[in-house]
Amino acid sequence: MYHLGQDLPGNDVDDIEDLISADDVKPRERYENKKTVTVRAKKRSQIRLESQEEEEKPKPTIHESVIPGTQKVFVKTWGCAHNNSDSEYMAGQLAAYGYRLSGKEEADLWLLNSCTVKNPSEDTFRNEIESGMRNGKHVVVAGCVPQGAPKSDYLNGLSVIGVQQIDRVVEVVEETLKGHSVQLLQNKKKVHGRRVAGAPLSLPKVRKNPLIEIISINSGCLNQCTYCKTKHARGDLASYPPEEVVERARQSFAEGCCEIWLTSEDTGAYGRDIGSSLPELLWQLVEVIPEHCMLRVGMTNPPYILEHLEEVANVLQHPRVYSFLHVPVQSGSDSVLGEMKREYCRQDFEHVVDFLRERVPGVTIATDIICGFPTETEDDFEETMTLCAKYRFPSLFINQFFPRPGTPAAKMDRIPANLVKKRTKRLTDLFYSYEPYADRVGEIYTVLVTEVSHDKLHYVGHNKSYEQVLLPMRDNLLGTRVHVRITSASKFSMVGEILDDERDWTRCAKNQELPNVQVQTRSRERLIQRYFGIALVLGSLAFLIQLVVRLL
């Protein structure tokens, strides 16, 4: 198993449960994106100038006669933890075959893994494609955008890897470097009449963070939300067998991971297609979690968690499971939820939150809101405001509605943009009006330290409630459990001081850096030896043929 250093450009991918994303589209980027889609009349001189630029655009170098597996690849990812995991798998296969992962400037090929949830994400994805081609790079695209809309004009002529074909990334990259275009968008074959969830979980990985393993437990979902484009890409629910998920977790811990993230489009729906359930899987997983390591359950929609509330509450109280759940509500109005086809009402969501807060001490509930859905009235929005004011969620992801092509909601009459912005600002102001951690100063927690903060100034640990605690950067601190006292707090995190001496830190994972370098080197050596051997055999054969010809 290979691990990718955190400083590698293009590898800073934040998952949907993160509070602050370094990869979010900035206002300046959004402005640049808009410029690329503005329709305006062009003067003849402009057309001639653009034609000249097209002719001057550098062409990608064709690697027809170069040994495969010796080039450099840049990997960039947009979107959720599921996409992040897919990128780690693709990077792992490329590294295992000898390809070197690099920054964008020195790379021969760019592998771009896309997200189709929001318009700005697709806009930046499209701009990155254009940037790569403008700089003479080979480009391979992957993820939900090409899977959901493969006939998009800007994808013409590009190599495409479908969401269920990531185990074939090496052959796609090889052919692309030779100047060919390959498109693999088909679903995996069914096994015993059941749709397969995707590529095998046993594939090699290059992890974004060597301490964290992201496991996709299922692909697709059972819903038909009117605003969602991801359904077009990921399809209906397909779950991995529990024994495969458990084995992947066991292997990850053996390789030095100290935290597992379960991810999918809806973890609560897990197992319904294979006669299992999320609680059954969770109880099997806790049996293989080593002491001092942790498990985090990913996003689950209200309808399916309702059926298992008691069991889920029990699992979340387990000492090696974070007391955290991401349950997106999207709106506080039953009318809007009906138009969204969310298959639950506000009362259902409130029951989930109330039950978990009562049964699971210190539980953190994160949720999502869409502002400005086409049918949302002022009264509907007020219901959303009262819901958020009632629960004061510490993690609240606020999104403006984006009409995604091909979805039913895209055909509905839209609310004026200025009204959508006004509502978004009102909800954002409400969210920033309270400090969820203001009363924590002086509290003592045990935290698992697994990450580096976005500003690179702190290490990041999480307590049992998966609340973020910033710590001073000290040698050997990553991958340990330590006791901390909270000294200050902000909107999104707390700052702590370490109470333990270094000799008392509890290490939950062994150092994997040296073995990874050795394994990767051995992989390249085997590749070189293989081609050297082939060349030697061919050379000997040619010599024998010449000798026979001379004798005759």
Curated annotation (Swiss-Prot):
Its EC number is 2.8.4.5. Its cofactor is [4Fe-4S] cluster. Residues 438-500 form the TRAM domain. Residues 207-438 form the Radical SAM core domain. Gene3D superfamilies: Methylthiotransferase, N-terminal domain, tm_1862 like domain. It catalyses: N(6)-L-threonylcarbamoyladenosine(37) in tRNA + (sulfur carrier)-SH + AH2 + 2 S-adenosyl-L-methionine = 2-methylsulfanyl-N(6)-L-threonylcarbamoyladenosine(37) in tRNA + (sulfur carrier)-H + 5'-deoxyadenosine + L-methionine + A + S-adenosyl-L-homocysteine + 2 H(+). [4Fe-4S] cluster 1 binds at residues 80, 115, 144. Residues 31-61 are annotated as: Disordered. The chain crosses the membrane at residues 532-552. One of its GO terms (molecular function) is N6-threonylcarbomyladenosine methylthiotransferase activity. InterPro entries: Elp3/MiaA/NifB-like_rSAM, Methylthiotransferase, Methylthiotransferase_CS, Methylthiotransferase_N, Methylthiotransferase_N_sf, MiaB-like_arc_euk, rSAM, rSAM_horseshoe. The keyword Nucleus does not apply. Belongs to the methylthiotransferase family. CDKAL1 subfamily. Catalyzes the methylthiolation of N6-threonylcarbamoyladenosine (t(6)A), leading to the formation of 2-methylthio-N6-threonylcarbamoyladenosine (ms(2)t(6)A) at position 37 in tRNAs that read codons beginning with adenine. This is Threonylcarbamoyladenosine tRNA methylthiotransferase. It comes from Drosophila melanogaster (Fruit fly).
